[in-house]
């Protein structure tokens, strides 16, 4: 078949490079770097490697703001995943990754391959994946297409995670109209590693072979990285070829084989990296660039599952379940023998060179020859103009929303039926969250917890972000996202260690959007510094807009914490009647950005809830101390729906009730004031708990009751609700909406 690729002249004159994702100035920069016009393959290499998805060219100035260091950090940003130290020679590797655009076009495969990709990132570090989480955003469940997206995305996550045998243990889902045509699918993987086994994605040692392992290369996913770096349109729905297809059973074999190599052949393994976004070109050029080396690849040797593939297609394909290894000379047969035991191909496709060039050979001809750093390191970095949106000042000056609360119990029931608040059991029951048998706290509490085998320790993990707060005030909302994640870890008995961030925003070329990105990063950074949770990995997903309509700023925070002793594991549900109920933190009339405002006004506006990071840190440390001293029976973070929702949720599991008198007016029952915790303690621990919390804003509210009635009083006012009725509404809402 003749090669019909455009000539260098056609690429320039017809501006074909623009269709591939390069701007005029970027194309001119490539010409300047090469001292000539790039051919079609070279233009393709630069277009994907200089995409936002691979180069972070728009977000780098913002990412530099994040604190990335701490005594607990074993590996910060720059590798497949970040790693924190948990003692005993062990580390926890984790990262969040987005697969937003593919999940709108092809929701099952888009979500499934997002899971597969993040798993490979974690095991490429040498870590065994032990848990998956996800953070999902959809439009309102009022159209068949919205229901289809939810069902298919969840099925894709479940299909891949369940098949590969990694438990999906937690996550969050929010529903808002801005996500109708811009769903967000962020997957997080957590792995356990012996510190001595930490790997690097590098190709060094002149003459060392580079080996391709795993599935054969097809034409799926070509320009997937570019596809994820442009604004979406209705026509974009036709770009199904940019969505990859996953095979979890192949990935399971690849995972076990790679971990075998790392464990048993670390002396001959130089580096290992996943072929993710931008496929072979990304992994190979990054590995060489990190090592200060060059690379020569023979494309004829790349395993192919389709006929007549061009070097361009092989390099840019995002076919799944593929890894790239660099091994020491003379040991290829050993590596091949190991992979053959798993029925996997392991093929030498090139070698490390000393000239810092990225040379591609096909049919004996050099088809691309460019400086490797130009691809992997030297993408232009843009300092985008930033402008405060007009809405921000309007929100600051707006009269506060006052909810209609004539029928408090009626509002309570309505809130529990909102899909963002309602039980997600219908969704998480599709996930196998008990596989591997180490899940200590299953989905449905504040954080998931997975035991560390052979120790008394456990890992607490969560994903969090209330994007409505970020829409009102991205700096405050960014800080709240980190604070809430830490609250969830602490409520579960864990000490927060570090975060991974999935930065989902609209089009950064709009100054108002870039302002959101900058301010959100400022808020995240401030909270991470105060709470000592450095950013050790992450992902940026921009251009989440369709036909000019963008999402709320949605920086998903994935956080991991250490539970020092299994005895410290704490859940949100009340345990025994007679236990004493306390509220930590102050409740104010803060409804802007709340579920209640959305319910009653049909929109979000006003000033975001206040957050005092000093107070937040103090309350978290006090509560964690109380948990570690064995004083706490249950602990629950107050989030969407405020006190009323948290109190109801605490009664549901055991079907208990509560009799409480609150220090705030009943119309503030659903306020979303920050830095609050609902805690229950056994009567014999009440005095010790109260003494520990002395001088703080901690209120004794009442007791857990045996009947299934919740009574809430303030002075002369009282409301009463049946636990069973509230639970029925809460559990039935999402199955009903998805019908």
UniProtKB/Swiss-Prot annotation:
It is found in: Cytoplasm. Mg(2+) 1 binds at residues 97, 539. GO terms for cellular component: cytoplasm. Mg(2+) 2 binds at residues 121, 274. Its EC number is 6.3.5.3. One of its GO terms (biological process) is 'de novo' IMP biosynthetic process. The active site is at residues 53, 99. It catalyses: N(2)-formyl-N(1)-(5-phospho-beta-D-ribosyl)glycinamide + L-glutamine + ATP + H2O = 2-formamido-N(1)-(5-O-phospho-beta-D-ribosyl)acetamidine + L-glutamate + ADP + phosphate + H(+). It comes from the Bacteria. One of its GO terms (molecular function) is magnesium ion binding. Part of the phosphoribosylformylglycinamidine synthase complex involved in the purines biosynthetic pathway. Catalyzes the ATP-dependent conversion of formylglycinamide ribonucleotide (FGAR) and glutamine to yield formylglycinamidine ribonucleotide (FGAM) and glutamate. The FGAM synthase complex is composed of three subunits. PurQ produces an ammonia molecule by converting glutamine to glutamate. PurL transfers the ammonia molecule to FGAR to form FGAM in an ATP-dependent manner. PANTHER family: PHOSPHORIBOSYLFORMYLGLYCINAMIDINE SYNTHASE SUBUNIT PURL. Belongs to the FGAMS family. This is Phosphoribosylformylglycinamidine synthase subunit PurL. The gene is purL.
């Amino acid at each position: 078949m003749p090669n019909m690729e455009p000539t260098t002249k056609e690429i320039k004159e017809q501006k074909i490079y623009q269709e591939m994702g390069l701007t005029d100035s970027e194309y001119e920069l490539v010409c300047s770097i090469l001292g000539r016009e790039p051919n079609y393959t070279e233009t393709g290499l630069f277009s994907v490697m200089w995409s936002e998805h691979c180069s972070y060219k728009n977000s780098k100035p913002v990412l530099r703001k994040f604190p990335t260091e701490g005594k607990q950090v074993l590996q910060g940003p720059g590798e497949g995943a970040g790693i924190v130290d948990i003692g005993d020679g062990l580390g926890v590797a984790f990262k969040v990754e987005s697969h937003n655009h593919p999940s709108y076009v092809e929701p099952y495969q888009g979500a499934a391959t997002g899971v597969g990709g993040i798993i490979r990132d974690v095991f490429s570090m040498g870590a065994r994946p032990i848990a998956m989480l996800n953070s999902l955003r959809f439009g309102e469940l009022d159209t068949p297409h919205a229901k289809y997206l939810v069902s298919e995305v969840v099925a894709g996550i479940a299909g891949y995670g369940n098949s590969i045998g990694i438990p999906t243990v937690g996550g969050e889902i929010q529903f808002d109209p801005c996500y109708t045509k811009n769903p967000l699918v962020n997957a997080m993987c957590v792995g356990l590693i012996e510190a001595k086994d930490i790997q690097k994605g590098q190709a060094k040692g002149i003459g060392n072979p580079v080996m391709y392992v795993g599935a054969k290369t097809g034409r799926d996913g070509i320009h997937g990285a570019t596809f994820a770096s442009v604004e979406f349109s209705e026509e974009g729905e036709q770009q199904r070829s940019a969505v990859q297809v996953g095979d979890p059973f192949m990935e399971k074999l690849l995972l076990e084989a790679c971990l075998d190599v790392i464990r048993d052949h670390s002396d001959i393994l130089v580096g290992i990296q996943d072929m993710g976004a931008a496929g072979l070109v990304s992994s190979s050029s990054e590995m060489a660039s990190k090592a200060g080396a060059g690379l020569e690849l023979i494309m004829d040797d790349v395993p192919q599952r389709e006929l007549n593939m061009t070097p361009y297609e092989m390099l840019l394909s995002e076919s799944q379940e593929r890894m790239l290894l660099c091994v020491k000379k003379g040991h290829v047969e050993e590596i091949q023998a190991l992979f053959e035991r798993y029925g996997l191909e392991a093929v030498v496709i090139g070698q490390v060179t000393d000239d810092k060039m990225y040379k591609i050979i096909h049919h004996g001809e050099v088809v691309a020859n460019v400086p490797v750093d130009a691809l992997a390191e030297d993408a232009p970095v843009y300092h985008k103009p930033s402008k405060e949106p007009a809405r921000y000042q309007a929100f600051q000056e707006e009269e506060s929303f006052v909810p209609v609360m004539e029928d408090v119990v009626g509002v309570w029931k309505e809130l529990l039926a909102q899909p963002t608040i309602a039980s997600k059991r219908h969704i998480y029951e599709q996930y196998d969250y008990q596989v591997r048998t180490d899940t200590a706290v299953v989905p449905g509490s504040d954080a998931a917890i997975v035991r560390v085998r052979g120790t008394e320790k456990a890992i607490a993990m969560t994903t969090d972000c209330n994007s409505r707060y970020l829409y009102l005030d991205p700096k405050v909302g960014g800080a709240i996202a980190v604070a809430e994640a830490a609250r969830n870890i602490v409520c579960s008995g864990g000490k927060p260690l570090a975060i991974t961030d999935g930065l989902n925003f609209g089009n950064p070329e709009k100054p108002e959007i870039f302002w959101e990105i900058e301010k959100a990063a400022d808020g995240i950074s401030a909270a991470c510094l105060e709470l000592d949770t450095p950013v050790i990995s992450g992902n940026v997903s921009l251009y989440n807009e369709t036909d000019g309509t963008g999402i709320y700023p949605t920086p998903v925070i994935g956080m991991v914490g250490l539970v020092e002793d299994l005895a410290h594991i704490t859940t949100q549900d009340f345990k025994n009647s007679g236990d004493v109920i306390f509220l930590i933190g102050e409740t104010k009339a803060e409804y802007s950005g709340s579920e209640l405002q959305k319910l009653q006004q049909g929109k979000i506006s006003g000033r975001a809830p206040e957050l005092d990071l000093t107070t937040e840190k103090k309350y978290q440390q006090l509560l964690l101390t109380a948990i570690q001293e064995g004083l706490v029976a249950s602990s629950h973070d107050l989030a969407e729906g405020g006190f009323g929702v948290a109190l109801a949720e605490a009664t549901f599991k055991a079907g208990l009730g509560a009799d409480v008198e609150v220090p705030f007016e009943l119309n503030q029952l659903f306020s979303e004031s920050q830095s609050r915790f609902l805690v229950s303690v056994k009567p014999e621990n009440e005095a010790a708990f109260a003494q520990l919390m002395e001088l703080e804003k901690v209120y004794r509210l009442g007791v857990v009751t045996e009947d299934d009635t919740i009574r809430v009083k303030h002075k002369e006012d009282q409301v009463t609700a049946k636990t069973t009725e509230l639970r029925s509404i809460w559990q039935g809402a999402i199955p009903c909406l998805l019908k």
